[in-house]
Amino acid sequence: MAASPYYLRQTHAPDCACSVCWSVRQAIPLHNPSPCPDCRPPGLPYLEGGRWLCRPRSFCAKHDPSRRPPKYWHVVYDSGKPTPFVPVREDFQLEG
């Protein structure tokens, strides 16, 4: 089914409420400029010598992600020296 040439490439009104215009208004731009002037976003891919290349992204010292996993042991309660496990071989009675 061919679309009528009357409808092709027609601009929508500024206050159009159709789903296409709504989704365009809701879209988040892909390449957000970095708030930090020292951080460099990745470059757009370009063709050089038959191979696609891309300038890598780089971060400043403040925003450089750590290569180690995040520390999570700060949430564990430290109750002091560990108590070793001593198995009891004989039965005992509670006093009381």
Curated annotation (Swiss-Prot):
InterPro entries: PflM (IPR035229). This is 10.9 kDa protein. It comes from Pseudomonas phage Pf1 (Bacteriophage Pf1).
